Amino acid sequence: MSDETFYITTPIYYVNGAPHIGHAYTTIVADAFARHYRQRGDDVFFLTGTDEHGLKVQRAAEEQDMSPQELCDENSAKFRDLFERMELTHDRFIRTTEEEHEEVVLDVVERMKQSGDIYLDTYEGWYSASDEAYYDESEIEDGKAPSGSEVEWVEEESYFFRLSNYEDELLDWYEQDATVAPEARKNEVKSFVEGGLDDLSITRTTFDWGITYPDDPDHVLYVWVDALTNYLTGIGRLHDEEMFEHFWPCDLHLVGKDILRFHAVYWPAFLFSADIEPPEQVFAHGWWLVEGEKMSKSKGNWVDAGELIDQYDLDVLSYFMLRELPFGNDGNFAKERLVERNNSE
């Protein structure tokens, strides 16, 4: 193995729906990084995969008269098939329903418990199933989350993580060079933490599609505790410690700006609690918009990446996505621009 390593990840993608060009963009960018560092001679590990637990997945399965596992199997295969068509060079495609992953999640939770950072209480507040996120009253406007997603009032017994214990440690981490980028995104999370952190509800009792909380079968773990830990599982945590030590900490978590808080606040705090080194950098890129709006199936402006490959060729699509959108910014997607870019360059 080379002494120089480069470990890059995409977020793992929800399986409540099929992949679209937003998923393709993140993964194409990550693939470009992976290819570049391999050409430099670095020992590269590129991880992607699917996020398969949570209320959103359970509800999507119910709507389609399927079991959650059936939905996960069907839609995870769609992501895997698309990535094969895109000729991506990922080293592993991880699924959070894998038994190996559950073992790693439970180990991280146990380490957080041993740190004294988990306690039982009652959660009352706003929750968005679409975002799989909790929101303060101050963040709700016209009955919706900042993302525009619908929210519901939740009151239930919950285990909490003492996120408030890690304000100073997080702020110190942000002061290190480029731990969160671009700079504007770092300033966002710094302001969020400086405003004071509430402890985080990390279990739910109103659905059962998830990893059961240890020693309390009425609770399942909050999907982000589960999902974020994939970055440890993917490089052998507990199962190949030599590989894990070789590649961790992660050099680059590449994420969309809508999930920055999870990766740049919750994730490093979980790692601090579990006595695991935090990542080197979290980079939040912008969104592909359609007529100024974020792409979503509910809005009917969803663009199928596979259809674009069929129509325009993989190289054309990949070049367009890397060339058209300034890295870190939002940009509007239009087929006319794709054709124009291809014909002019």
Located regions from the model:
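Structured secondary-structure scaffolds
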Residues: S2-G41, L47-T48, E100-V104, S147, ...
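N-terminal Rossmann-like or analogous alpha/beta NTP/dinucleotide-binding catalytic cores
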Residues: S2-Y119
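Residue-level "edge-of-site" marker
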Residues: T50, E74, T96, E124-W126, ...
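Short secondary-structure capping/junction motifs at helix and strand boundaries
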Residues: M86-R95, K113-W126, S138-E139, W153-V154, ...
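Short secondary-structure transition/capping segments
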Residues: E87-E100, D136-G143, D330-A334
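Short, surface-exposed amphipathic charged segments that create phosphate/polyanion-binding patches used
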Residues: D107-E110, D136, S298
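Cys/His-rich short segments
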Residues: S115-E167, L171
